[in-house]
Amino acid sequence: MKLVFLSHVSDCAGGAQRCLLDLLRGLKHIHPDWQLYMVLPGPGDLLDACSPYIDGYRFLQMEWWLVGKDMDIGTREKLSYIRKLSKYSIKLTRYLRRIKPDYGMTNTVVFPHLAISCKMLGIKHCWFIHEIPDVTWLNLNPVFEFRFIFRAIDKLSNKILVTSRYAEFHYQKVMTSAKISSITQAVELPMTVGVDVKCDRHTRYTILLVGAFDSNKGQMELLQAVKRICLL
């Protein structure tokens, strides 16, 4: 089996990148004979972290179809984006022809290049969406209307993965429901050592959540799960 993954950034700081790293690590552990490839904008610590698990990579600069709030988006800008999208999708197609993957996975909602290239070559494609841009990214505007972007994601995907039940319910309204599944534990947590499993149950626990917060990330689902555990 050959799989190719597309990342929108080259650093390893964000949750989407951590999900991708853990996915590559897990796949290589379970299926050491599989060949895994990456496409990303350029060198960085994401490639350094993923290198032990991949068999090849390609650098390719791709423009997002989400831009800053202060940028005007007219017909001229849309046509310019379409030209660049076509140019770099064709470049990506050449790379796919060379590695001949069985499946492609886009690890972001911000551009469709891999999905389009897979469609052109008849390769199955999965979209792993970590964001709800029309709800949680209020500082960005889409080059095209969100309904067009969501329709494109739906048409260009065999499967759509999201990171929370909230995101699953949201995208089921705008995409084919049967294609969408949520992954509620996407990032590996380090094993806790030195815990006394025989300790008495406490009546109150304090949980500290650190990081970026929005409905898509599943923090509420975490708290609900902890509450259910405490009631056992």
Indicate residue ranges for each PLM-predicted region.
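Nucleotide-sugar donor-binding and catalytic loop/hinge architecture
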Residues: 1-2, 193-206, 230-232
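Nucleotide-sugar donor phosphate/pyrophosphate-binding loop at the beta->alpha transition
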Residues: 86-88, 124, 133-156, 189
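An aromatic- and histidine-rich active-site surface loop
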Residues: 85, 89, 103-123
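A short beta-strand/loop micro-motif in the catalytic core of glycosyltransferases
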Residues: 104, 154-165
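Conserved donor-binding loops in enzymes that form glycosidic bonds
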Residues: 8-10, 109, 185, 209-215
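N-terminal strand-loop element at the rim of the active site
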Residues: 7-14, 26, 30-79, 167-170
